From Swiss-Prot:
HAMAP family: Ribosomal_uL15. GO terms for molecular function: rRNA binding; structural constituent of ribosome. The gene is rplO. Belongs to the universal ribosomal protein uL15 family. It holds the Pfam family Ribosomal_L27A. PANTHER family: 50S RIBOSOMAL PROTEIN L15, LARGE RIBOSOMAL SUBUNIT PROTEIN UL15M. The keyword RNA-binding applies. One of its GO terms (biological process) is translation. GO terms for cellular component: cytosolic large ribosomal subunit. Gene3D superfamilies: 3.100.10.10. Part of the 50S ribosomal subunit. This is Large ribosomal subunit protein uL15.
Length: 144
């Protein structure tokens, strides 16, 4: 094999349509656009969503909803998520860095879901009664 003998795979390169090159090609004169009308002219096409002057669908339908600035930014964390964390001291920042809670989280609460197999210390993170019992059962603690 030589560089000057390399060719693209069979059927991978289609030859482009050559329009306006005579009657015999089947795409001569009007180039497959037909006669007259907006679509036959150069630059003659409507914008996306245009309905011929009728009020477009995206403007006929009402706006819906809004993003509340006062929404709760409290998140739930499972025990199995804590088990996967590489650190032993867990606070809100550690949860955010690990991607368990989003960066805009204001508080987090550990819930009894799954199991925990290692000792962890929670700082500034809430926990339900069941989660507290599970954490303390494996030798962990909750510092509030």
């Amino acid at each position: 094999m030589r560089l000057n003998t390399i060719k693209p795979g069979e059927g991978s390169k289609k030859t482009a349509k050559r329009v306006g090159r005579g009657i015999g090609s089947g795409l001569g004169k009007t180039c497959g656009r037909g006669h007259k009308g907006q679509k036959s002219r150069s630059g003659g096409f409507h914008k996306v969503g245009f309905e011929g002057g009728q009020m477009p669908l995206q403007r006929r339908l009402p706006k819906r909803g809004f993003n509340s600035l006062t929404r709760a930014r409290n998140y739930e964390v499972r025990l199995t998520d804590l088990d996967r964390l590489p650190v032993d001291e867990i606070d809100l920042l550690a949860l955010q860095v690990a991607g368990i809670v989003p960066g805009d989280a204001l508080s987090a609460k550990v819930i009894l879901s799954g199991a925990i197999s290692r000792k962890v210390v929670l700082k500034g993170v809430g926990a339900t009664k069941g989660a507290k019992a599970a954490i303390e059962a494996v030798g962990g603690s909750i510092a509030e």
